[in-house]
Amino acid sequence: MMLGAVKMEGHEHTDWSTYYGEPECYTSVGNMNTGLGMNSMNTYMSMSGMSTTANMTANSMNMSYVNTGMSPSMTGMSPGTGAMNGMGAGMTAMSTALSPSMSPMTGQPGSMNALTSYTNMNAMSPIYGQSNINRSRDPKTYRRSYTHAKPPYSYISLITMAIQQSPSKMLTLAEIYQWIMDLFPFYRQNQQRWQNSIRHSLSFNDCFLKVPRSPDKPGKGSFWTLHPDSGNMFENGCYLRRQKRFKCEKKMSMKEPGRKGGDGGSANSSSDSCNGNESPHSNSSSGEHKRSLSDMKGSQALSPEHTAPSPVSQGQHLMSQHHSVLAHEAHLKPEHHYSFNHPFSINNLMSSEQQHHKMDLKTYEQVMHYSGYGSPMTGALSMGSMAGKAGLDSASIPDTSYYQGVYSRPIMNSS
């Protein structure tokens, strides 16, 4: 038996420090099974087929010290019926054979995951640590190259840049697509997705205008240009952030119902009207709209059953107005609903209009009469507490000047 080689005495600390090349790792008793670094003879981190009666010496196992009072008497460790799998399986029933002065202790069954195994092996066996360091990493391109990254520009910024760099300050939709793909390689893939977003940005932003082709410029598709009143939407030529969102005031004021028609004629009429020179199409559409309104008014005048409300509906309207007036009066006079003779009701506190000036005195006397505490409480504080208990709001009995300002007549006559 080589139990003497594993004995950890306090005065032999220098010998142990020379034996271990790295600083010692201290763990607790509960985590003792996870702090055992197992040396293997043939494999990287596996402990296979050891006898249950054989004791493990310092040559076959690197032990981590336990910073409890058992270091002077620990002699060795023997494995129980457990085995440790390759990369961190469960260590079960690890029993330690201690000296006769201490009772044998069985380690708690636990599981060593891969991270714990790596940290323990690196802390106690420098052989495995160095072999782990010397491993070369596979040279893979984990990140896309910078030139193929997505540009930090919005679709409105891309369209504005494309139009502004054009000599004629006008581009077709296909030319905008081509300019974006030539400048940014990111947009050479997933073309259907971002081109759909470009079309939406052109249609739903007032800063872009659709210009029809002139006869001297034959071709396919209309031109897109920037609105002349949009100005500098981007601060100091920086296209990363828009300074303001342009809204066409004329388009917002007109509110044409056929604006969302979807055909090219309505888009042209809206863009031309936004420029200030309205096309004949827009004039005719506005004239038709006015004629339809006049026809509708005439039909309503001819049919009295549509204009004059029925007696039932008129009665319902009057009832709703009456309910609203009653609700407003109830909001102003919350004491109107309390018809019972309560000690703190308005009827008892102010029996006549001549006693308005005595309200504070009567309130104080009644509160002190009903409180029964005898403490020098103020009338307003006791009043609030008693009114809260009785179910009344304390705000229903404020100063008399409030009611005199709200009502033109005294309160007693108004109820």
Swiss-Prot record:
One Pfam family recorded for the sequence: HNF_C
Record key words, sorted: Activator, DNA-binding, Nucleus, Transcription, Transcription regulation
Biased composition (Basic and acidic residues): 251-262
GO cellular component: nucleus
Principal cellular location given in the protein's record: nucleus
Keyword Transcription part of the UniProt annotation: yes
Disulfide feature: none
Region (Disordered): 251-324
Matching PROSITE patterns: FORK_HEAD_1 (PS00657), FORK_HEAD_2 (PS00658), FORK_HEAD_3 (PS50039)
A GO MF term: DNA-binding transcription factor activity, RNA polymerase II-specific
Cell location: Nucleus
InterPro entries documented for this protein: Fork-head_N (IPR013638), Fork_head_dom (IPR001766), Forkhead_box_C (IPR018533), FOX_domain-containing (IPR050211), TF_fork_head_CS_1 (IPR018122), TF_fork_head_CS_2 (IPR030456), WH-like_DNA-bd_sf (IPR036388), WH_DNA-bd_sf (IPR036390)
Free-text function comment from the UniProt entry: Transcription activator for a number of liver genes. Interacts with the cis-acting regulatory regions of these genes.
Protein name, as recorded: Hepatocyte nuclear factor 3-beta
Organism of provenance: Oryzias latipes (Japanese rice fish)
